Amino acid sequence: MHISSMYTKGALLAVCTLASVPSLSSGQHETHSTVMSSGWRMVPMDMNMPMLPGLEGTVPAVGPFMPGMMVDPATLPEARPSRLVPLADMDTLDISVSMVRRTIAGHEMIMFGYNGQYPGPLIQAPKDATVIVRVKNEIEMPTTIHWHGVRIANRFDGVPGVTQEAIRGGESFTYEVHVPDAGMYWYHPHVREDVQQDLGLFGNLLVTSPDPDYYGPAHREEVFVLDDILMDDQGALPWGEESPTHALMGRFGNVMMVNGETDHQMDARQGEVVRFYLTNVANSRTFNVTFGSATMKIVASDVSRFEREQLVNSIIIAPAERYVVDVRFDEPGEVAIANTIQAINHFRGEFYARVDTLSVVTVDNQSADPGVSRAFETLREHTGVAEDIRPFRPHFGRKPDHELVTTVKVQGLHPSIVLSMESDTLYAAPMEWNDAMPMMNWLSTAEEVTWILEDMATGAQNGEIDWDFQVGDIVKIRIHNTPDSFHPMNHPIHIHGQRFLVLSMDGVENQNLVWKDTAILPVGSTMDVLVEMSNPGEWMIHCHIAEHLHAGMMFSFTVTNQLP
């Protein structure tokens, strides 16, 4: 069964809807009171971005959803911080999916959690181990767990209707998670990610290498899970019930968090080298992470180390990507870890600098071990990565096997939105760092917006695309992000079950390669990727902006074992 039969555009079938969950009309939290008879609350607006004429009182074409509408938050356990769970080969971990109580920016809310934690447990396992994860679903929504980036056996990939049936409330499913590659991975649902992931269902999986010198020396390691959430003075804004809202740009939050904290802080010593494992779990936001005056070098990304370490000023990390960076804090004082972007105001036709603090590091004047501090100066060459890539180099310069183009079509959007979008000439900005049109974005749902991946050779779109490969195939794919669609937007492209190299962007060759499972494609750009088809099964390719996924931007391909 191909994915199109499960992820039906608009309807999204039972496992991908919230229709079985009590609607807002059945009850409200005190902190989730409505301001409209429909149950919706007005999306927070920037005072510099006026509402379009004719949109007053307009609400999305779907019903609002909030979790646990008949539940008293006081009866739920308060979410706990993530805990490290070291596992050996063939160890078993039980995970429950349940409602939890969270307080964010002063608002008490019902959210979801894995084992009552927010983020979920940090699972640690050695490379080449297999760990058993037994999942019990204790929420009303069906769910699954997708082991993002892991080249896992297909039947455990967590895609409803393709690799398994969704885990309904009260039911369980057992995953066998084999981890062939060292690095930082993460796990999350593949049922209405726009809701479940945003409500807290995510966690990291750290796969350790047997090589003690796999990464360079560091005084310590920190895991940073980057996220945002959309809130007003009542708490979290409702999600779409029948299908997602925010289908044009994805749901940007206005409150940013590190490891679920809005005021994250940490301490460091002068000269201390801290290894940061960064994961972006936001629905739509791409972060540009800076570390103030500290010195940063990039070490690894999704599925491997880079060919060589490199000093950088910032890290652009799209939804679902991971990066490993080493940072040395040279001077005492406070260092702000920030999201530093060039935001856009479409109404005024202006770009402006915006800096949002994610965490504050207080560096004292006690010196860290100087040997590790000096070792940071060395930019290491990862010869093992270069040797791993070497057999693929003969394929770099050849013509692409497949070409895709991204676009969008709309039907039934409010005429004021259509007129405004068609008259705006600024939408070719390479990256949408912020929600520059919150009202229009909120009103657009997956009922009216279809995001498209189109096979340029056949004209097939999304679920119509039907690619077949053999294990061992090396496939070059060229992806174009057209700048002249109704609303061009950057897309983090995720390929399940395999690994790939980003060979070039806009014809400029990548001089420092790393194995990836997700890569950002800016507006107007063309990206060449080389995919190693090593893992048999039926696998997804999709945009990892959650709302774009559920607005159709996905298809599946099949990898089969060659006959003996």
Predicted regions and their residues:
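Histidine- and aromatic-rich segments of cupredoxin/plastocyanin-like copper-binding domains
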Residues: 155-168, 238-400, 506-510, 514-516
